[in-house]
Amino acid sequence: MNGLEAALPSLTDNSSLAYSEQCGQETPLENMLFACFYLLDFILAFVGNALALWLFIWDHKSGTPANVFLMHLAVADLSCVLVLPTRLVYHFSGNHWPFGEIPCRLTGFLFYLNMYASIYFLTCISADRFLAIVHPVKSLKLRRPLYAHLACAFLWIVVAVAMAPLLVSPQTVQTNHTVVCLQLYREKASHHALASLAVAFTFPFITTVTCYLLIIRSLRQGPRIEKHLKNKAVRMIAMVLAIFLICFVPYHIHRSVYVLHYRGGGTSCAAQRALALGNRITSCLTSLNGALDPVMYFFVAEKFRHALCNLLCSKRLTGPPPSFEGKTNESSLSARSEL
């Protein structure tokens, strides 16, 4: 993970990073576009995830594993969104970090902690869907809210430990009367960077894709299922994979290219700028995850959709909102209908 890439920088490293920063400076137009993007992203993601988290906490009695994972996903998204205003200030200030060293470390730590936590919670949701649909009876003892909470606690601890180096290593560099926070876009790379990227992203991504391929095969080969239930499962698969492909795949592909460049050295200023711009764009896409997850809730969770209509529609819906999931039982059809 990115925390594993953070090493104590030498003077040579800082000089190289300063050179990269000078070559990668944005134009005023680029700064304005990035700032507008983060402002819109912050508003949409904050409202959507705050509403989702309130609903998940309010409906905690439903006691389903998927609800637990969705609640932790909303917490991760909301925590990640709360550091986006620092990027707004950075771009409005003309690539200058005015907050100092400690806030820079905290911003990097919180952003990457919650980004990778979101990735792993999406993977947990995929695994839960796989067990519920492909092995509905065998997984009854495993798919319990307590186990889901324990899994989430374990993931929070693991990701926090992996990101901890961001809190202890210097992350600011001064260039031409401006201070740059390295954790906003260009993390310091190390020899462990590619290996950490593989552990942090490749494993959960492959796991998620595998789960959904097996789910699709089960839906095609299994007993006859109502069309709307099958469509709901396909909708869930499409949404989660779309979030991975839009938000996380471009960033990690570009990150691998950047790490290889960093270790190679001798890159022209034009190439440095291209890499810097790529970092900014793909990082924007990762932060978009916070705005897209509530869209997923809307399409796959009936209670979220019901509550949102109650808030926005002039005519409030009558009757109690449906649960996010039905009560788990030993029926394959019931398990397939969850979410």
Curated annotation (Swiss-Prot):
Disulfide bonds join 104-181. It is a multi-pass membrane protein. PROSITE patterns: G_PROTEIN_RECEP_F1_1, G_PROTEIN_RECEP_F1_2. Residues 1-36, 86-105, 169-195, 254-280 are extracellular. It holds the Pfam family 7tm_1. GO terms for molecular function: G protein-coupled receptor activity; receptor serine/threonine kinase binding. GO terms for cellular component: plasma membrane. It is found in: Cell membrane. GO terms for biological process: negative regulation of inflammatory response to antigenic stimulus; oligodendrocyte differentiation. Signal peptide: none annotated. It comes from the Eukaryota. Glycans are attached at residues 14, 176. The chain crosses the membrane at residues 37-57, 65-85, 106-126, 148-168, 196-216, 233-253, 281-301. Residues 58-64, 127-147, 217-232, 302-339 are cytoplasmic. Keywords: Cell membrane, Disulfide bond, G-protein coupled receptor, Glycoprotein, Membrane, Receptor, Transducer, Transmembrane, Transmembrane helix. Dual specificity receptor for uracil nucleotides and cysteinyl leukotrienes (CysLTs). Signals through G(i) and inhibition of adenylyl cyclase. May mediate brain damage by nucleotides and CysLTs following ischemia. Belongs to the G-protein coupled receptor 1 family. This is Uracil nucleotide/cysteinyl leukotriene receptor. It comes from Mus musculus.
